[in-house]
Amino acid sequence: TKGKGSDNIKKLREYLSKSNELEPNVKNWASNIYDDYHSFQKGVDISKKYDPEFVSTNFNSQNLSELIKTRRSVRYFKKQSIDESILKEIFDVVNWAPNSCNRQAIKLFVKSNSSEEIKELMKLNNGATCMNVPPVFVSICFDTKGLVLPIEREVAYIDSGLGLQNLILMAHSKGIATCVLNWTHAKQSQEDSLRKKLNIDKYHLIIANMVMGYPSKGSPIPTRSNLKDFVIWR
C-alpha cells in the first residue's frame, strides 16, 4: 500500500547507515529493499523484480542422484594439494543453499597445505578424523551477530548443514573427497584452542569441522534404509 511503513523504512535506513557489523552483502541487500520501496512509492513498477518467473533447469536428475548416492565420507587422502581456484569454486556454492532471512551467515575458516598445522587441528577432534594428513582442514562456523532471539540459535545448525551439503557435493563432482568431523563432544579447552589457531571470533559459532582432499582409497557402501522406513504418507 502506498505510504504504508514509511516510518519503519526511515528507521531501517538510519540503522543501515550506522551499522558496521552487518556483512556488506546483507547491508547491500537491505539497502536495495529500501531503494525499491521508494521507487514503488514514486509509482515505478517493480513487480517483475519481486514476482519473477520460476527458473527451470535441464540438468539430468539421474546425474544428480548418482552424485548424491556415490558420495562417501573418506578418511584416506593423497598428499596432492588442491588448487586454490578449485577450492574457491567449491566454497562458492555454500551460500547458494537455502538460508534463513537471506543472512548468508556461514563462515569457512580454511587451513590448507600445511601438514603440521592440520595435524594439530585434527588432534582437537580426539582422533575422530582420518588415517593420514589431508591437504585441507575447514572449520564451518556461523556468524551469530544477526540472530536476535535465543530460539534462533537452532537456525545456525540448519543453515550450516544445508550449505555444507552443497560444498560436499560440489567437491565430490570434482573428484575431491570430504569427511565431516563431529564437534559436539569438544571440551571448552579444545574449542579455545581451535579458535586461537584459526583466529575464530567469539561470535562465530563453531558448527563442525571437515577435512578434504583427493582420496587414496574409497569407503564401503553402507546399507541405507528403504523408502518405506522413513517416508510416512498421511
Which residues make up each language-model segment?
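Acidic, surface-exposed loops and disordered segments
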Residues: T1-R234
